[in-house]
Swiss-Prot record:
It comes from the Eukaryota. The keyword Oxidoreductase does not apply. Transmembrane segments: none annotated. Homodimer. This is Sex hormone-binding globulin. SUPFAM superfamilies: Concanavalin A-like lectins/glucanases (SSF49899). It comes from Homo sapiens (Human). One of its GO terms (cellular component) is extracellular region. Functions as an androgen transport protein, but may also be involved in receptor mediated processes. Each dimer binds one molecule of steroid. Specific for 5-alpha-dihydrotestosterone, testosterone, and 17-beta-estradiol. Regulates the plasma metabolic clearance rate of steroid hormones by controlling their plasma concentration. Residues 45-217, 224-390 form the Laminin G-like domain. Residues 1-29 form the signal peptide. Its main location: secreted. It is found in: Secreted.
């Protein structure tokens, strides 16, 4: 075996160091590696309680007993928007919110000293664990991410012990007032996980509710949209991109990553007649049907976009190089056009109302007229839907609860 002298070894180490520094400058930023979850740590909690602004847990603190004025936690998410935590002594004139918008931390603050909304720091919606700390120092609020100070707000607060209302509430994953009361509204529900959290001064804590999140954070995830069996999202057709007028045309695209079971994938209809036009999964085939007439099918191929194109005379189902067309009878055109004319016209994703469906599936996206739809913006959706993540293994997400 060839041996290297001290000089050669030193040169090799110097070369490796220079290469590392070079890649760091080119964007391979060095990040602190957070330790993995220990068996002694409490389990991570999921931050979403479903649609709406309901928090998963609420804690109350006696500010007259506060000696520690900082809170810290680790958060992991693929979701670019939502509330991490909210705090107040009075929801009308003294409140604070830390959330994400476009993947980056955002602080909203309203009190006697300041009213502001400010975003700062790196994107946190990359599916990794990030350490976050919020501190109060005198009249300042500090935000640290992964050990680095990313924001310092001066002259925005007084001492906690001088608050007119000496009881502070902290809510996780939601708000204690309507989302419209925020200075800059956002979608409160955050599809993310939180662990190793420490809130203010434990000695000053008066009460704490048990977390009510619907999902376990033990499952490794990838970005996407996951619908467990029997779940659905419902969009008003007037709230999504509209059909092309001349000639009339409308398209839907599904990026299927995982699929199992049998049942509906999507449908166009009304609450009274939800399946005027539908796609459902059966025997590893995607079946297109219109009303009670004959349908057509394509073999299920995961990873290729599944596209549905509607025109005045036919519906085309395609995936990759395979394509089939379903002719529409002349009498079928009026109900199709009426779906967009009626306020109750709907796009259903997943199980139909009242359907006993065993289908579970993961999408890397859902598009109408080429524009991505956000499940958080659905008219209604099941609480159990994973709005921005999918289990890495198909079987792991079917039991989504703790």
């Amino acid at each position: 075996m060839e041996s290297r002298g001290p000089l050669a070894t030193s040169r090799l180490l110097l070369l490796l160091l220079l290469l590392l520094l070079r890649h760091t400058r080119q964007g391979w930023a060095l990040r602190p590696v957070l330790p993995t979850q220990s068996a002694h740590d409490p389990p991570a909690v999921h931050l979403s309680n479903g649609p709406g602004q309901e928090p998963i847990a609420v804690m109350t603190f006696d500010l007259t007993k506060i000696t520690k004025t900082s809170s810290s936690f680790e958060v992991r998410t693929w979701d670019p928007e939502g509330v991490i935590f909210y705090g107040d002594t009075n929801p009308k004139d003294d409140w604070f919110m830390l959330g994400l918008r476009d993947g980056r931390p955002e602080i909203q603050l309203h009190n006697h000293w300041a009213q502001l909304t400010v975003g700062a720091g790196p994107r946190l919606d990359d599916g990794r664990w990030h350490q976050v700390e919020v501190k109060m120092e005198g009249d300042s609020v500090l935000l640290e991410v992964d050990g680095e100070e990313v924001l310092r707000l001066r002259q925005v607060s007084g001492p906690l012990t001088s608050k007119r209302h000496p009881i502070m509430r902290i809510a996780l994953g939601g708000l204690l007032f309507p989302a419209s009361n925020l200075r800059l509204p956002l979608v409160p529900a955050l599809d993310g996980c939180l662990r190793r959290d420490s809130w203010l001064d434990k000695q000053a804590e008066i009460s704490a509710s048990a977390p009510t999140s619907l999902r376990s954070c033990d499952v490794e995830s990838n970005p996407g949209i996951f619908l467990p069996p029997g779940t659905q999202a419902e969009f008003n057709l007037r709230d999504i991109p509209q059909p092309h007028a001349e000639p009339w045309a409308f398209s839907l695209d599904l990026g299927l990553k995982q699929a199992a079971g049998s049942g509906h994938l999507l449908a166009l209809g009304t609450p009274e007649n939800p399946s005027w036009l539908s796609l459902h999964l059966q025997d590893q085939k995607v079946v297109l049907s219109s009303g009670s007439g004959p349908g057509l099918d394509l073999p299920l191929v995961l990873g290729l976009p599944l596209q549905l194109k509607l025109s005045m005379s036919r519906v085309v189902l395609s995936q990759g190089s395979k394509m089939k067309a379903l002719a529409l009878p002349p009498l079928g055109l009026a109900p199709l056009l009426n779906l967009w004319a009626k306020p109750q016209g709907r796009l259903f994703l997943g199980a139909l109302p009242g359907e006993d469906s065993s289908t579970s599936f993961c999408l890397n996206g859902l598009w109408a007229q080429g524009q991505r739809l956000d499940v958080d913006q659905a008219l209604n959706r099941s609480h159990e839907i994973w709005t921005h993540s999918c289990p890495q293994s198909p079987g792991n997400g079917t039991d989504a609860s703790h």
